[in-house]
Amino acid sequence: FGTGTHETTRLCIELIEKHMREGDNVLDIGCGSGILSIASLLLGASHADAVDIDPNAVDIAYTNAGMNGIGRDTYTVVSGNILADDELDKAYSGKKYDVVEANIVADVIIALTEKIPKYIKDGGIFVSSGIIVERLDDVLEALKSRGFALIEVVKDKGWAAVASKYEG
């Protein structure tokens, strides 16, 4: 995970490349190595905020960003649990992102569907993966129940990634 070789990472980047627009601002939840937010910036995002529950992810993501010529003026990484930390939740609720990305696991994505409407603009794109195909219907149902319309599902080797649009 986080190196670009795992199916979920490749599927997410494929969807980001298709659905993100140049100049979009991005929130990467569960950023790990930073690969999705860094790819988004390299593909033309104007700014990316990234968060991960593992404090080690901050230095790793900043190191990887630097290796790709991305500075802290366009990239911000913090450590915390966006599902449990009220202060972190408030910080991201104060912004509205064009694109929200999460490559985690189905259960966390389902939990995030309750929070993401606070972070995403109307018409914004949510790209999610880390979903085994057996859990895809559960994720799609959670998205639909929270005001997301399905744009596209891509699959590879038992994994799925979803692009959906927030319609409020």
Residue ranges and their predicted role:
Residues 53-167:
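S-adenosylmethionine
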Residues 3-82:
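Conserved SAM/SAH cofactor-binding pocket of Class I
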